[in-house]
Amino acid sequence: MAPTLNAPEQIYADSKFGDTVFPPFSVDGKTITMTYNTFENRYEAETNHALRHQAAEVFYAELARHRHVTASAYNSRVQQEKIEATLRGYDSVFSFLLADQEVPRELYDRQIDVIMQDLAPIMQKYARLLQRVYGLSSMTSYDLKLELDPSFVSTISYTEAATYIKDGLSILGEDYVQMLSRAFDERWIDYAENVGKCTGAFCAEVYGVHPYILSSFNHRMDEVATLAHELGHAGQSVLTCSAQPYLNKEMSLYMVESPSTTNELIMENYLLQKAGDNKRERRWVLSQMLSKTYYHNFVTHLLEAAYQREVYRIVDRGGSVDADELSGIYRDVLTRFWGDAVEIKDGSTLTWMRQPHYYNGLYSYTYSAGLTVGTQMALRLMASSEVAGKADAASGKACGSKQNEVGQNDRSADENHVGVSDRQTVVHAWRSFLSAGGSLDPIAQAALVGVDITTDKPLKETIAYIGSIVDELVELS
């Protein structure tokens, strides 16, 4: 049955990678050729306004040519899920899809509703900052991927990226660094950028062997975070497969992005430390945290999740969807989130054609769910490392009793910090989380690291943290 049941996703992939070809176009007398990868990795954030907008128009015009077959494939998929939900006795397609994730409906709805309400004004503030920095007469949806500092150029070789990642993630333990070394040395990673190559970055788990990573390394410093992200999946895979039997190897979809996003944030905080007092470099790192890590997981995928929810509501009522209706739903979601801060271009309403995630049930919302736990964990790991570093420095100047006094002073100075003796405890808890695989449901798994996802507290704290990043970026700009 697999070829039949998987046909919608295969049709989507064949259309995207086999039939979607972008014609050359000219800007300022120069002929530009473009692929899916070069649009998403280069032209979408191009600082030349004319080139960026023309690339977007060409990109979405080509997507529009395939919108009906893509919509038909997607409608087939969601209808299939609804039929299966009914046959299995579920009261809704939501209950059916969330059962596999082992989370109640309220966690799913809360993730979407709270972010749409609380994060929207923060991101609108960021959009206005971009508009001011670039001197744009109007801020459009084609401008949202712009870098905050267009003249800050930071390139890195693949070998240098490997060194940065091993150094930055050393907080997770010596054997974790050894795993990272194996990934680079034994060529687990396909990093070359090639025509026809699948877009994005992915990690494939192979039980009993090792993971494989697909990426397109473009020698930009932000690729360090992307590689760290995928290596987060790889590290979780290695630890899970060594601790769990085959049937328990798969972590709930709700939690699957936590290991990856935690790695991203650890790396970005590592880069912040290296920036030191250099305000411009600090601004660049903070902008990467916002525009890459949080924008990707809390905005791009969350807006997709809000769109998906509307589609499944229609399907649950016995309806179906076509290309025009899908674009209309997406426009409404974009408009609700960005308000009057951003003009929504027609092409952006075709964003529903860009992701394969929709063929994997309620996947998109889990990026923000995973990053919520990831943020809480990364902050604790970084705090434990910082306090341990202070105590280690103090140990060279004081006797044992004085060391204890310093540790107590550090602990009382910041309630979020843990003492040096707790650093290993924090890391051990996180390693237990990574090793759990599918042996625990998400609520119990989050509890391993002291995060209670039955409340909105972790989510609201994460949104507040994002807000603090935007505030500092405004101050530094």
What do these predicted regions represent?
Residues 1-106, 110, 114, 167-168, ...:
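His/Asp/Glu-rich acidic catalytic environments and adjacent acidic regulatory segments
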Residues 89, 218-238, 260, 370:
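Active-site recognition of the HExxH zinc-binding catalytic motif
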Residues 93-94, 100-175, 409-411:
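A metal-dependent hydrolase signature that marks the N-terminal structural subdomain at the beginning
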Residues 139, 227, 235, 273, ...:
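C-terminal, non-catalytic "cap/extension" segments appended to globular domains
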Residues 154-156, 189-209:
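Catalytic zinc-binding patch centered on the HExxH motif and its immediate surroundings
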Residues 156, 208-227:
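Short pre-active-site segment immediately N-terminal to the catalytic Zn-binding motif
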Residues 247-259, 293-296, 323, 360-367:
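Active-site metal-coordination segments of metallo-dependent hydrolases
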Residues 251-280, 296, 370:
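Post-HExxH zinc-binding segment in Zn-dependent metallohydrolases
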